[in-house]
């Protein structure tokens, strides 16, 4: 494993991964619904200099409603496209992405003894979670093109 990586060179691997993730992100961000609304919102830095081999996104219908990440994951899985969805076991990032305040979180947790993902969505009136797409050493351009082709199937669709 390590000898293989050393034989290629970490700088070459990083350059290739950056190229693939930039191609993917730019391709996704270029897709618009016929009414001009964006299909994808990407979280994190806009540039690629300090971005690793993944992007965190959500898909939206033509009216701007977020398409549930679980639906996206089911659709991609049926096409043998591997993504990760949810809150990524990363406390705080989802709250930042959706502008959920400390006060809202305190109010939620102080008002119940238990609850789950759907319960907090209903309480806050805000969607939670996102989709993470990762590329790496084994990713080829065809893999990225398949994800972009999938994204095109969401254009102008209502869920």
List each model region and its residues.
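Pyridoxal 5′-phosphate
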Residues: 1-159
């Amino acid at each position: 494993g390590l000898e293989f990586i050393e034989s290629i060179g970490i700088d070459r691997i990083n350059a290739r991964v950056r190229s693939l993730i930039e191609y993917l992100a730019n391709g996704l961000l270029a897709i618009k619904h016929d009414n001009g609304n964006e299909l994808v919102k990407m979280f994190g830095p806009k540039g690629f200099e300090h971005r690793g081999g993944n992007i965190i996104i959500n898909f939206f219908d033509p009216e701007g409603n977020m398409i549930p990440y679980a639906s996206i994951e089911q659709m991609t899985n049926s096409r043998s496209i591997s993504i990760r969805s949810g809150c990524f076991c990363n406390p705080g990032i989802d709250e930042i992405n959706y502008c959920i305040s400390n006060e809202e979180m305190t109010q939620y947790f102080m008002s119940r003894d238990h609850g789950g993902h759907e319960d907090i969505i209903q309480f806050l009136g805000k969607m939670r979670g996102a989709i993470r797409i990762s590329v790496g050493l084994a990713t080829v351009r065809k893999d990225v093109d398949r994800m972009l082709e999938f994204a095109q199937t969401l254009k102008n669709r209502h869920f």
